[in-house]
């Protein structure tokens, strides 16, 4: 019996301790005290009412509550700091962070070592940064409503979701409005950012030095720029919408080996797509519609494949300043051009004549803008007629040897169409007063 008792005690100690569900009343200091007294794995259930921030969660816990449970930082620092693994924050309102940009004040901050955090179904309102994933691995930020601040200068605002050096982050199903960027991902990798809605921001999604990640199924409406992929490699950008964004829909700047597919950009952006010093990218099955420039291709971008895209009703379909021929078809399949008067006698869906979207006068106008005064002159019209009649006189540029006869269709729901119309009606009232996306050193 003496020998058996220690064995029984050891077995009992090895059994998992049952997590408790603890009701936490609203009031000053009640939440901080409840965290201090909780055991790992406990569930703290808040009641409707106001709770004092700033709080630090330093052990694995779940904190849940109704939307009426408000954690308020009262303008001081970060409202909720997660500093332990396996923490869940669900169903709450988080508001009132400080406004210190150097300290990265936020509604919710996930620190290094706080792996597998889950932040879901919360309202994160009126903070400098909404959710700052700052070193924690495999975080999940899902189905939150995040609304930032509206300082006069957009660049003085914080980001809805900031991901820094946090591999494996999943950002899914969030609605982000106001602030600077919807998602700003910096020095990270293997993230998935999908099915989010972004409105009234500088950039919807902004990548810097982020590799091996995915941006898919997102909707950007009325932002300064939709999807900015910068200094990043091996990114998948697919099935996103950019509706009535102001400057660009999709931008690849020093981005390599990306796959850009199934995206729709429409509604009057200056450039549907901007490709700047980006190499070996596959751009296919996209629809670029109703922009000043369909695609601007510059700074020596090489070895890119463009096939199966549609360029529809853009004032200038392609802006490419170069003297070399660049082929924009792949394996006998090119792109659809709304201004190509082609015909298809073979009935295979491929036009029987190649298409060049630009001519010599386009190159002259891009390099010498003052020449625009001469565009109506008979000599200019004669040059354009001669080049259309004798293609061998063209100086080089984009050539599509297998233009498509039909355009890919990408559906937009009634809800997003209504939001697009609202954003278009407010375009002249945009808050993007200090936006200069073409200054590529400023991001």
Give the predicted meaning of each segment.
Residues 2-9:
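Sec-dependent signal peptide recognition
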Residues 21-52:
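Acidic Gly/Asp/Thr-rich repetitive segments characteristic of extracellular carbohydrate-active
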Residues 36, 51-64, 71-116, 129-136, ...:
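Extracellular beta-strand-rich solenoid/capping regions of secreted or surface-exposed proteins
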Residues 80-91, 108-120, 135-142, 150, ...:
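Surface-exposed loop/turn motifs in large extracellular/passenger domains
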Residues 271-272, 282, 289-443:
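Functionally critical loop-and-helix segments that line ligand-binding/catalytic clefts
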